[in-house]
């Protein structure tokens, strides 16, 4: 408890006496969430603050307010992890992190970009559907429509989620109770399970339960991969041929220079 209080006291003194935020002397840190920034209630999330700087201490803020707990795990590698356990709706919000040098002068960094942590389940589940049936051919387009049931009179945002991706892949503000998300020029990497949700864009950041997942399958026409591979091979072979020709020219010039006798060289000199 005492080391924790001393750490916070040191940080507040650094802010009060040596805040050089924005002078560019310290790089801005990055803040990420694992396993996701959109999680159900009672789950655990790890917020990781990272910077290339060394010999620093980290601080986590929520809505601009310093969080006195949980205590970060300081690391000599320029990173700290903040473990948020048994999350409730009240834990949703905008998080940032920053750091300061442990040694004098205690320079304070800029804060990271805002990470919005959403705890789902407070609002009713939306419905996700697609206009395409079956599988989608690579290079095509997929439209996913997300529709909510609630009539809310506060600003909201729709989010498209993909299983295995730690943050929403698309965000859109609706004009009504539904919104269309588009996946353009799809590839095999776009295949997977998708869901959608919506949330309030202001505090308390209430969020809906995610919709049921919808699987998107992408087929690659036969020969497409081999054609691209062949084209790549042709390009590589062409570049290799150009390099060989240039090297050959240098070798010929070097050989000619070594085999021309001094007398022959003098013969080319003007009288």
From Swiss-Prot:
Post-translational modification: N-glycosylated.
Gene Ontology CC entries for this record: plasma membrane; specific granule membrane; tertiary granule membrane
Tissues and organs where the protein is expressed, per its UniProt entry: Expressed in fetal and adult liver, lung, testis, thymus and spleen. Expressed in blood neutrophils.
Main location as per UniProt: membrane
Annotated disulfide bonds: 49-97, 146-196
All ranges on the Cytoplasmic side of the membrane: 258-271
UniProt entry keywords in alphabetical sequence: Adaptive immunity, Cell membrane, Disulfide bond, Glycoprotein, Immunity, Immunoglobulin domain, Innate immunity, Membrane, Receptor, Repeat, Signal, Transmembrane, Transmembrane helix
Compartment(s): Cell membrane
Ig-like C2-type domain location: 27-113, 126-212
Segments on the Extracellular face: 17-236
BP-aspect Gene Ontology terms: adaptive immune response; immune response-regulating signaling pathway; innate immune response; negative regulation of CD4-positive, alpha-beta T cell activation
Topology in membrane: Single-pass type I membrane protein
Transmembrane segments: 237-257
Residues linked to a glycan: 44
InterPro entries linked: Ig-like_dom_sf, Ig-like_fold, Ig-like_Receptors_ImmuneReg, Ig_sub
GO molecular function: immunoglobulin receptor binding
Signal peptide as annotated in the record: 1-16
Functional note: May act as receptor. Negatively regulates TCR-mediated CD4(+) T cell proliferation and activation, possibly by binding an unknown ligand on the T cell surface. Enhances Toll-like receptor-mediated production of pro-inflammatory cytokines by macrophages and neutrophils.
Subunit-structure text: Interacts with Fc receptor gamma chain FCER1G.
Full protein name: T-cell-interacting, activating receptor on myeloid cells protein 1
Organism: Homo sapiens
């Amino acid at each position: 408890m005492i080391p924790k209080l001393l750490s916070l006291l040191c940080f507040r003194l650094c802010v009060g006496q040596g805040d050089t935020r924005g002078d560019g002397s310290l790089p801005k840190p990055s803040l990420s969430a694992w396993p996701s920034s959109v999680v159900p209630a009672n789950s655990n999330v790890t917020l990781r603050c990272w910077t290339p700087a060394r010999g620093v201490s980290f601080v986590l803020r929520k809505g601009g307010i310093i969080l006195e707990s949980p205590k970060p795990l300081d690391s000599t590698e320029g990173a700290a992890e903040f473990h948020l356990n048994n999350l409730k709706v009240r834990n949703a919000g905008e998080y940032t992190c920053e750091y300061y040098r442990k040694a004098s002068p205690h320079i304070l960094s800029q804060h990271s970009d805002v990470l919005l942590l959403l705890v789902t389940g407070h609002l009713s589940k939306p419905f996700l559907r697609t206009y395409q049936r079956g599988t989608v051919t690579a290079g095509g387009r997929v439209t996913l429509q997300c529709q909510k049931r609630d009539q809310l009179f506060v600003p909201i945002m729709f989010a498209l989620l993909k299983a295995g991706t730690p943050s929403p892949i698309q965000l859109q503000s609706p004009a009504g109770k539904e919104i269309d998300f588009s996946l353009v020029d799809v590839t095999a990497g776009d295949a997977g399970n998708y869901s959608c949700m919506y949330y309030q864009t202001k505090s308390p950041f209430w969020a809906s339960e995610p919709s049921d997942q919808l699987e998107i399958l992408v087929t690659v026409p036969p020969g497409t991969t081999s054609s691209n591979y062949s084209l790549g091979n042709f390009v590589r072979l062409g570049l290799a041929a150009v390099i060989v020709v240039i090297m050959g020219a240098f070798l010929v010039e070097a050989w000619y220079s070594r085999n021309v006798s001094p007398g022959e060289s003098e013969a080319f000199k003007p009288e």
